[in-house]
Amino acid sequence: RLSFDGQAYQVSVPDLATASDWTGALMFLKTLLVLLDVSVCEHDGVDYDKDSILDFHFTDIFLSALSELTKEVKVHPIVEIMGVKRPIYINELYLGQIIHVPDDQLLNSYDQRLRFTQQLNAYYSEQQVFKIEQNGEDIIIPINYLNSEGRTILPSQPELEPQYLQEYRGSKVAVARLFIMTADGEKLAELPYREFLESLTEGIYMLDAKYVLVDPISPEMLQKLSQK
């Protein structure tokens, strides 16, 4: 994040930023020092110029923040951290997959996993909610859509999304549904959400603590699902 208070520019990098993000920020800062023809910026009492700014040691900052995150996921089921394009949700299982590597591979493991969540070319399935009335009672039906022809990001649990919880408080929630669609909007199949996810033995990957990535659905798989 770049800010200017009228006297000085400030470049802020989250403590849990990836090594790639840190490197990019330091390269940008070096360019800024050159363009503004200034020679010194200060961090914790240490001076850096355009020739030494790339030597800034961010590793200690990152490792300290990662240690705090490790403690936090033991207290909270899911911890949300900031991403470039979308938030990243972390729990003990997901964090364990990242950090249980040799020490010299930790930065790269963290970098690759988090960048993958941000740079992924996939359809992000946003939940829609439909309300019907049955016997004088409001019933809420959560629905997600899966693109049969491309990779799709889906919530890992068939739950009502937080933005709908207050709006439909007190309403009965029906079994969440999944519509399998073509890229042109044709519905190919409709399935119970949880049943679909549990039926996948391949082509499904943990994206983070709240979302999974599902590969395109083959005609054979689609036929099998349609027969259920």
Predicted regions span which residues?
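Short, intrinsically disordered low-complexity segments
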Residues: R1-T23
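Short amphipathic beta-strand/extended segments with alternating polar/hydrophobic composition
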Residues: L2, K50-F56, L191-P192
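Acidic, low-complexity cytosolic segments
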Residues: D21-V46, K50-I53
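Generic surface-pattern signal
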Residues: V34, K71-V75, Q227
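Short, flexible helical or helix-coil boundary motifs
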Residues: L36, V73, I204-L207
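Aromatic/basic-lined ligand-recognition segments
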Residues: L54-F179
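Extended, charged low-complexity segments
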Residues: Q163-K228
